């Protein structure tokens, strides 16, 4: 197994994503998110929002311009799975960056190893009130 294709390497890529996204580092997100990036947010009322790479970076840039402070970096790691140059990370997050309210985020993150680094290709995020546990 390549040293880059380990659970530890995926965890490091995800830690980097969390650190840069929670600090609204749009330049870093440009290299973290794959050119074909797509995210799906399922809101608590079951409405769905989708973003491509440009749109999602704009979402973070807007929060930075509005003076949003650093988002919560808390994460609970559930699973890492690597298959060739693809990987999936399943985790739970807590932060207010998706809708302005501190929420629990159930995340399924797909990564692709390309250009010598892991890049986030897809995110499926289900937002739930913190009161749900």
Give each language-model segment a name.
Residues 56, 74-80, 92-95, 106-112, ...:
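Hydrophobic/aromatic beta-strand elements that line small-molecule binding cavities or substrate pockets
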Residues 84-86, 115:
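Residue-level signal for tight coil/turn positions that link beta-strands
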Residues 1-35, 132:
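Short, low-complexity N-terminal intrinsically disordered segments enriched in polar/charged residues
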Residues 104-133:
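Short beta-strand edge/turn micro-motifs at domain boundaries
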Residues 40, 90-91, 121:
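Beta-strand residues in well-ordered beta-sheet regions across diverse protein folds
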Residues 26-82:
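A solvent-exposed, acidic/Ser-Thr-rich amphipathic alpha-helical stretch
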Residues 59-62, 89-93:
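Short Pro/Gly-enriched beta-strand edge/turn motifs at strand-loop
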Residues 96-102:
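Short, cysteine-centered beta-strand-loop-beta hairpins and adjacent loop/turn segments enriched
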């Amino acid at each position: 197994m390549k040293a880059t294709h380990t659970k530890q390497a995926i965890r490091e890529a995800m830690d980097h994503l969390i650190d840069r996204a929670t600090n609204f580092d749009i330049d870093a997100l440009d290299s973290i998110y794959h050119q074909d990036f797509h995210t799906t947010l399922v809101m608590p009322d079951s409405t769905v929002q989708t973003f491509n790479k440009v749109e999602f970076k704009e979402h973070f840039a807007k929060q930075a311009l509005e003076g949003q402070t650093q988002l919560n970096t808390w994460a609970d790691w559930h699973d890492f799975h690597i298959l060739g140059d693809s990987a999936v990370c399943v985790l739970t997050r807590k932060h207010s960056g998706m809708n302005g309210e501190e929420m629990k985020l159930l995340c399924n993150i797909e990564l692709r190893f390309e250009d010598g680094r892991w890049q986030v290709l897809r995110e499926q995020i289900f937002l739930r009130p913190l009161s749900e546990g």
